[in-house]
Design a protein with these regions (language model features):
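Membrane-proximal transmembrane or re-entrant/amphipathic helices at the cytosolic face
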Residues: 384-387, 392, 413-484
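Helix-terminus/linker motif at the lipid-water interface of multi-pass membrane proteins
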Residues: 15-29, 92-93, 150-152, 211-242, ...
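Interhelical loop/hinge segments that connect adjacent transmembrane helices in multipass membrane
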Residues: 131, 135, 174-215, 254-269, ...
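Helix-loop junctions and terminal segments of transmembrane helices
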Residues: 14, 44-63, 125-126, 236, ...
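Signature of the first transmembrane helix
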Residues: 1-49, 76-88, 140-149, 164-172, ...
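Hydrophobic alpha-helical transmembrane segments
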Residues: 101-108, 136-182, 198-201, 235-237, ...
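Alpha-helical transmembrane segments of multi-pass membrane transport and lipid-handling proteins
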Residues: 12, 71-96, 101-106, 146-154, ...
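Membrane-interface junctions at transmembrane-helix termini in multi-pass inner-membrane proteins
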Residues: 54-63, 112-136, 159, 180, ...
């Protein structure tokens, strides 16, 4: 519950912070930051050495393992920070951005704080003190947001975003170590860490594939279209990605935990129902936001962000479909078939880079449409390819998503009719959004009433269930027999 509440607050904080920072900075500064951040983010994928995902399974009495992990992470963090800062020199020269080196150097310090957080975070997870980690995360994000706004207000530009990134990881590291620091012994054994490194390697490979692709994307867009368009592209991409993935994180975690311990037939049912619930929440929000993008950008961000509109209209619905289709990934992780997810992500990253490359002939709008097409192919792959392993077949999932998708399209149409009739001022925009939500609700009741009742019943059972280590035995409504 604590993690879910913190996740919700962070989403709200990001949604409030995005327009404020966009107003204060503008596309040029966001474009410069977009060149710097993927470099550090890519290297950051190595910062926990694969230990973050597995160290919590180790008994705290195993001092050799915990001490070895601490020293390995310290060495890794310092080494990666130096390598990142050095690479910043090369990237700054290639991108012809003299400020880029300093910003990457500041961001590189966060790598040390990331590694300092891994061991105490694992100890807290093992002790099931997840609330402490959630509180530290929330505190760090609030302080980071305040510092970013203050610096941006004083004209610090892209430095304010870099400072926010660094402060978040620094505050989080300090708070986690205050809660669970244990002085390591002066011992080290690589053999003691071997199985932890092997287990975490697959997830690191997936993250590297994704971030490397985005780094190449940003570099190509900067070279072909300039920093201003890169800033708008990155902002639209970031808003869409953060909003949709943040909404899906809790569902991802629930599927992973249940797949580790639950019966496979029940996991199939849970996957189908949670995908539907995610679609019910995301489809109207993203479709309406895409329809209202011209008014939202004009009213909240101003004319200098006018190029952002098209990116939001494409990326918001696309990412909504993507996060729903990716809910097979936690089941693959639990079943030991993460390799399927890796190859799908690798194909997506390669396809996105090729789509951006076509922008040389098609323009940036054509490249963005190509990215959307590649992402939809990825969605189909994530539904089809894992089906034999997970038992989660495509047609039942699509049947559950049809109602929310159709209703979301009708809601968007309702919004557009209201705005076209009454104008594009803020009153008409609010009326259009309200009308769209009403249209969505009525459409769902008309075409999907029975499923809505079952969704409510299942959601109420999951939420009201007391905390337990035992998996839920059935995810069907209590008044009907289990069926796929």
């Amino acid at each position: 519950m604590a993690s879910g509440a913190v996740n919700a607050i962070k989403i709200i904080l990001q949604l409030l912070l995005f327009p404020v920072m966009a107003r204060l900075l503008g596309p040029d500064e966001f474009g410069l930051y977009a060149l710097a951040l993927p470099t550090v983010a890519l290297i950051a994928l190595l910062a926990d050495g694969g230990l973050g995902a597995t160290l919590a399974r180790e008994d705290e009495s195993s001092e050799l393992v915990w001490s070895s992990a601490f020293w390995a992470l310290m060495f890794l963090g310092i080494t990666l920070a130096l390598c990142s800062a050095g690479f910043g020199l090369v990237l700054g020269y290639l991108a012809k951005q003299p400020r880029l080196y300093g910003i990457i150097g500041l961001l590189s310090l966060s790598l040390v704080f990331m590694t300092l957080s891994v061991v105490p975070a694992a100890r807290l997870a093992r002790r099931k003190q997840l609330g402490v980690g959630a509180a530290a995360d929330l505190t760090a994000n609030l302080i980071g947001a305040a510092i970013a706004v203050a610096m941006a207000w004083r004209g610090s530009g892209a430095w304010s975003l870099a400072a926010q990134y660094l402060v978040i990881y620094a505050i989080r590291a300090v708070l986690l170590n205050c809660a669970a620091f244990h002085r390591p012994r002066a011992v080290f054994s690589f053999g003691a860490l071997r199985h932890h490194l092997v287990s975490g390697g697959a997830m690191i490979a997936i993250r590297i594939s994704d971030y490397a692709g985005r780094l190449v994307e940003n570099f190509l867009i900067n070279r072909m279209f300039g920093t201003t368009l890169l800033g708008s592209y990155t902002f639209g991409n970031q808003v869409s990605k953060v909003a949709t993935e943040a909404a899906s994180n809790v569902i991802w975690a629930a599927l992973y935990v249940q797949a580790l311990t639950g019966e496979r037939s029940q996991i199939v049912i849970l996957h189908r129902r949670l995908c539907r619930m995610l679609g019910i929440a995301l489809f109207p929000a993203t479709f309406l936001a895409a329809a209202a993008a011209p008014e939202i950008v004009s009213l909240l961000l101003g004319p200098k962000w006018i190029g952002l509109t098209f990116f939001l209209q494409v990326f918001l619905p696309t990412y909504a479909f993507s996060v729903v289709s990716c809910q097979t990934a936690p089941i693959l992780m639990a079943y030991g078939r993460i390799d399927i997810f890796f190859w799908c992500v690798f194909g997506l990253s390669l396809g996105r880079v090729l789509a951006v490359g076509l922008g040389w002939w098609l323009g940036l709008d054509g490249a963005v449409c190509g990215i959307a097409l590649v992402t939809l192919v990825f969605c189909v792959a994530m539904l089809l390819v894992p089906a034999e392993v997970t038992g989660c077949h495509v047609l039942p999932v699509l049947r559950g998503l049809a109602g929310p998708a159709i209703s979301a399209v009708l809601a968007s149409g309702c919004y557009l009719v209201i705005v076209n009739v009454f104008g594009a001022d803020i009153t008409s925009m609010c009326a259009g959004l309200a009308g769209g939500l009403v249209a969505y609700g009525l459409s769902m009741i008309l075409i999907d009433r029975r499923q809505l009742g079952e969704d409510f019943s299942v959601a109420r059972r999951i939420i009201s269930r007391p905390a337990s280590r035992e998996p839920v035995r059935s995810f069907e409504p209590a008044n009907r027999p289990n069926a796929l």
